[in-house]
């Protein structure tokens, strides 16, 4: 099994962490949760704009028109898909009601799981493609996606637990949303493999960079602010950028990057 695929699987499995936190009865600090989302956004923004996009544009045979065009395609494509999918409400992340609720709530829980699953699928592809192109960037993206998946697990397990009263069912449904990300990575592994030209890989990287920027700006940062309105999510973003930038410098100094 390839390292990029393992990273994708681990990132997707982080959904279970959020799921278990949601059913253990321990309220996760909103401040920590919001900071982790900002931290993940910072990692994604720095990697996307300072590493992935420049590397894609510098690839042999890649034209600026194609490179920036794919970046914009990934950006707008994510925003369009995001508008069509149901969203979790931050105030529902820590819902603790254990009484089964009406069927309407069950339907909402199913739609929420479906929406997050569809949202996670391209993230799995993005993680695999990034790690396949550059392993050090793959580690960074996998970490950012894993941090992002923890509150997603919370988002799924809350309404499902409230709708069914079953911890096992809630964890199962949260796991399904995480498996969608793993499925995206597996499909990328099966379809792309090593038989892909540098130009095609660079184009995919540019599109993935656009997806990551949109995810950070449109979802992670606003969600962090909604979860913890009393603190600025920019602190987490700046910390994520600083830590990721410092780690990349260390790797390049050591001759790994």
Curated annotation (Swiss-Prot):
<keyword id="KW-0812">Transmembrane</keyword>
<comment type="function">
    <text>Mediates zinc uptake. May also transport other divalent cations.</text>
</comment>
<dbReference type="InterPro" id="IPR003689">
    <property type="entry name" value="ZIP"/>
</dbReference>
<feature type="transmembrane region" description="Helical">
    <location>
        <begin position="195"/>
        <end position="215"/>
    </location>
</feature>
<keyword id="KW-0408">Iron</keyword>
<keyword id="KW-1133">Transmembrane helix</keyword>
<feature type="binding site" description="M2 metal binding site">
    <location>
        <position position="120"/>
    </location>
    <ligand>
        <name>Fe(2+)</name>
    </ligand>
</feature>
<feature type="transmembrane region" description="Helical">
    <location>
        <begin position="32"/>
        <end position="52"/>
    </location>
</feature>
<feature type="transmembrane region" description="Helical">
    <location>
        <begin position="236"/>
        <end position="256"/>
    </location>
</feature>
<feature type="binding site" description="M1 metal binding site">
    <location>
        <position position="152"/>
    </location>
    <ligand>
        <name>Zn(2+)</name>
    </ligand>
</feature>
<dbReference type="InterPro" id="IPR023498">
    <property type="entry name" value="Zn_transptr_ZupT"/>
</dbReference>
<keyword id="KW-1003">Cell membrane</keyword>
<protein>
    <recommendedName>
        <fullName>Zinc transporter ZupT</fullName>
    </recommendedName>
</protein>
<feature type="transmembrane region" description="Helical">
    <location>
        <begin position="137"/>
        <end position="157"/>
    </location>
</feature>
<comment type="similarity">
    <text>Belongs to the ZIP transporter (TC 2.A.5) family. ZupT subfamily.</text>
</comment>
<dbReference type="GO" id="GO:0005385">
    <property type="term" value="F:zinc ion transmembrane transporter activity"/>
</dbReference>
<feature type="binding site" description="M2 metal binding site">
    <location>
        <position position="123"/>
    </location>
    <ligand>
        <name>Fe(2+)</name>
    </ligand>
</feature>
<feature type="binding site" description="M2 metal binding site">
    <location>
        <position position="149"/>
    </location>
    <ligand>
        <name>Fe(2+)</name>
    </ligand>
</feature>
<feature type="binding site" description="M2 metal binding site">
    <location>
        <position position="152"/>
    </location>
    <ligand>
        <name>Fe(2+)</name>
    </ligand>
</feature>
<feature type="transmembrane region" description="Helical">
    <location>
        <begin position="109"/>
        <end position="129"/>
    </location>
</feature>
<feature type="binding site" description="M1 metal binding site">
    <location>
        <position position="148"/>
    </location>
    <ligand>
        <name>Zn(2+)</name>
    </ligand>
</feature>
<dbReference type="GO" id="GO:0046872">
    <property type="term" value="F:metal ion binding"/>
</dbReference>
<feature type="transmembrane region" description="Helical">
    <location>
        <begin position="5"/>
        <end position="25"/>
    </location>
</feature>
<keyword id="KW-0997">Cell inner membrane</keyword>
<keyword id="KW-0862">Zinc</keyword>
<keyword id="KW-0864">Zinc transport</keyword>
<keyword id="KW-0406">Ion transport</keyword>
<feature type="transmembrane region" description="Helical">
    <location>
        <begin position="61"/>
        <end position="81"/>
    </location>
</feature>
<keyword id="KW-0472">Membrane</keyword>
<feature type="binding site" description="M2 metal binding site">
    <location>
        <position position="181"/>
    </location>
    <ligand>
        <name>Fe(2+)</name>
    </ligand>
</feature>
<dbReference type="GO" id="GO:0005886">
    <property type="term" value="C:plasma membrane"/>
</dbReference>
<feature type="binding site" description="M1 metal binding site">
    <location>
        <position position="123"/>
    </location>
    <ligand>
        <name>Zn(2+)</name>
    </ligand>
</feature>
<keyword id="KW-0813">Transport</keyword>
<feature type="transmembrane region" description="Helical">
    <location>
        <begin position="171"/>
        <end position="191"/>
    </location>
</feature>
<keyword id="KW-0479">Metal-binding</keyword>
<dbReference type="Pfam" id="PF02535">
    <property type="entry name" value="Zip"/>
</dbReference>
């Amino acid at each position: 099994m390839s390292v990029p695929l393992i990273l994708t699987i681990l990132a997707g499995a982080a959904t279970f962490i959020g799921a278990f936190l949601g059913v253990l009865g321990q309220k996760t600090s909103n401040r920590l949760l919001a900071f982790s989302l900002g931290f993940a956004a910072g990692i994604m923004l720095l990697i996307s704009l300072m590493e992935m996009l420049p590397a894609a544009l510098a690839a042999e045979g890649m034209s600026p028109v194609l490179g920036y065009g794919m970046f914009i395609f990934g950006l707008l494509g994510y925003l369009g898909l995001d508008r069509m999918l149901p969203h979790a409400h931050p105030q529902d992340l820590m819902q603790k009601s254990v009484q089964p609720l009406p069927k309407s709530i069950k339907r909402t829980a199913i739609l929420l799981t479906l929406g997050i699953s569809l949202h996670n699928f391209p993230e799995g592809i993005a993680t695999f493609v990034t790690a396949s192109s550059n392993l050090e960037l793959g580690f960074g993206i996998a970490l950012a996606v894993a941090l992002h998946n923890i509150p997603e697990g919370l988002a799924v397990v809350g309404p499902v637990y409230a709708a069914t009263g079953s911890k096992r069912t809630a964890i199962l449904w949260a796991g399904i949303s995480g498996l969608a990300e793993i499925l995206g990575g597996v499909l990328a592994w099966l379809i792309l493999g090593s038989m892909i030209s540098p130009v095609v890989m660079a184009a995919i990287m540019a599109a993935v960079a656009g997806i990551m920027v949109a995810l950070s700006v449109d979802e992670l940062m606003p969600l962090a602010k909604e979860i913890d309105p009393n603190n600025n999510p920019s602190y987490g973003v700046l910390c994520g950028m600083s830590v990721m930038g410092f780690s990349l410098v260390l790797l390049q100094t050591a001759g790994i990057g």
